[in-house]
Amino acid sequence: MNYFAVALGGFFGAIAREITGRALGTSIFPVGTLAINLSGSFLLLFFMTLFLERINVSDPVRLGLTSGFLGAYTTFSTMTKEIYLLLFQSKLLIGFAYLFLSLSGGFLSGILGRALALYLVNLNFRKNGAKDEG
């Protein structure tokens, strides 16, 4: 069941990546891949935090969303290829800027996703706690 959930999530994640990449278009700077990877980092830590802190979901749901959907949605290999091509084409500043933005931005996006999830968990806890006391 877990393999099926990961495969199904991966199917939809790959489609979402293709749609998002096409919608953002192409330019000298790989905005599409950067946006996909940053949003994927945000969503991965957001959902993992919710699953660990508050929401009890089955393994197939958790794995289908995280390893499946978000694993197929984000793309480390495409980022690596794009950085290589930029450097190979002597676009050093753009290549290194993309590398820096991808790594630091992915890390910061993940932190923001986790922070939002913790905020929502605590907000929900305060609301439910206040109702129980009244």
Swiss-Prot record:
Keywords: Cell membrane, Ion channel, Ion transport, Membrane, Metal-binding, Sodium, Transmembrane, Transmembrane helix, Transport. The chain crosses the membrane at residues 1-21, 28-48, 68-88, 92-112. Na(+) is not transported, but it plays an essential structural role and its presence is essential for fluoride channel function. It is a multi-pass membrane protein. One of its GO terms (molecular function) is metal ion binding. It is found in: Cell membrane. It comes from the Bacteria. Pfam families: CRCB. GO terms for biological process: cellular detoxification of fluoride. It catalyses: fluoride(in) = fluoride(out). Na(+) binds at residues 71, 74. One of its GO terms (cellular component) is plasma membrane. Belongs to the fluoride channel Fluc/FEX (TC 1.A.43) family. Fluoride-specific ion channel. Important for reducing fluoride concentration in the cell, thus reducing its toxicity. This is Fluoride-specific ion channel FluC 2. It comes from Carboxydothermus hydrogenoformans (strain ATCC BAA-161 / DSM 6008 / Z-2901).
